[in-house]
Regions:
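...captures the hydrophobic TM-helix bundle architecture rather than a specific catalytic motif
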Residues: 1-224
Length: 224
């Protein structure tokens, strides 16, 4: 079963890598491939769309390459365990899927779904040995700290929608020049809207990458 997991990841990486290299190499235009409706609430609607362009292709290749190495190492590491590790590899595959969803997203809502999927998979992997109190405590700490940071992240996405009336990358990026001088007043001080948005998104990234003040979960996560 472990060998099949590693082999499956190798085949997936090679197939997707070949397809993406062809996509990039032939210089095809940026485009999204809609797969399914993701959210439809009132007048708000967004689809699950895979977007391919130079940056996303690079990130997909990076995610698959690192994930392949992690899967290969995990196959060797978990082979010494007496109990089957099906649950572990399911969590690891979920992490890879969420990361791919994140880097291939076409809008901020899909990015957020992938973002939260990565957080969920991290929580499950850190707490895999649920019979160990240290691992369980580390998983809870990671989950709580990341949710605090994610609150800033989702508020940033909400503010983007309020300002630009869209979460689509193309629409938002095209409208940025017109919003450069837009300001909100906070405590009597005018602050540029884009600065607020960037700050909120940055705090969200700080939590996920365990940067200053939002890093305590990372050392504890090693217990998992």
């Amino acid at each position: 079963a472990y060998a099949a997991t590693g082999l499956g990841m190798c085949v997936t990486t090679l197939c997707v890598g070949n397809a993406l290299c062809g996509e990039w190499g032939y210089g095809l235009p940026q485009r999204g491939e809609p797969l399914a409706e993701l959210v439809h609430a009132g007048g708000f609607e967004t689809t699950w769309t895979l977007r391919f362009f130079a940056l996303s292709v690079t990130m997909v290749a990076m995610v698959l390459s690192v994930s392949l190495l992690v899967h290969v190492y995990s196959v060797w590491y978990m082979s010494h365990e007496t109990m089957p590790a099906y649950r572990f590899f399911a969590y690891l595959s979920l992490f890879t899927f969420a990361m791919l969803m994140l880097v291939s997203s076409n809008d901020l809502v899909q990015l957020f779904f992938g973002w939260e999927g990565v957080g969920l998979a991290s929580y499950l992997l850190i707490g895999y040995w649920y019979d160990r109190p240290a691992a369980t405590a580390a998983a809870i700490k990671a989950f709580v700290v990341n949710r605090v940071a994610d609150l800033f992240f989702i508020v940033g996405i909400g503010l983007i929608y309020v300002v630009f009336h869209s979460v689509q990358y193309d629409v938002v990026f095209a409208a940025v020049p017109q919003a450069l001088m837009a300001t909100y007043t906070l405590c009597g001080v005018p602050v540029r809207v884009l600065e607020i948005i960037c700050f909120l998104l940055f705090v969200g990234a700080m939590g996920k990458s365990a940067q200053l003040f939002l890093h305590p979960w990372l050392p504890a996560a090693l217990a998992g």
